[in-house]
Amino acid sequence: MAKGQSLQDPYLNALRRERIPVSIYLVNGIKLQGQIESFDQFVILLKNTVSQMVYKHAISTVVPARAISHNNNSNHAHQAAPVQSAEVVEKVE
């Protein structure tokens, strides 16, 4: 596992395993919402009414709809701040 993925993989896996709704902001400002179905080194499968394959290089930010706890390889817990979620997919200007 590459050093850069030592936090990314456990974080995404916790979101997937707990079926936490997420908002994914792309570098072009598009906001996608759904649940992480699966992921690998290059893509995330995001499921809502349809499944979308989102390339990681296009992602700016992943925001969970509620706080989560996960452990990375150094056993430090991290909690994400809860955010309000909306059902509408929108472009952030």
Swiss-Prot record:
Residue ranges annotated for the Sm domain, each copy included: 9-68
UniProt keyword RNA-binding present: yes
Superkingdom: Bacteria
Gene Ontology biological-process entries: regulation of DNA-templated transcription; regulation of RNA stability; regulation of translation, ncRNA-mediated
Protein name: RNA-binding protein Hfq
Assembly and binders: Homohexamer.
Similarity comment: family membership: Belongs to the Hfq family.
GO cellular component entries: cytosol
Gene Ontology terms, MF aspect: RNA binding
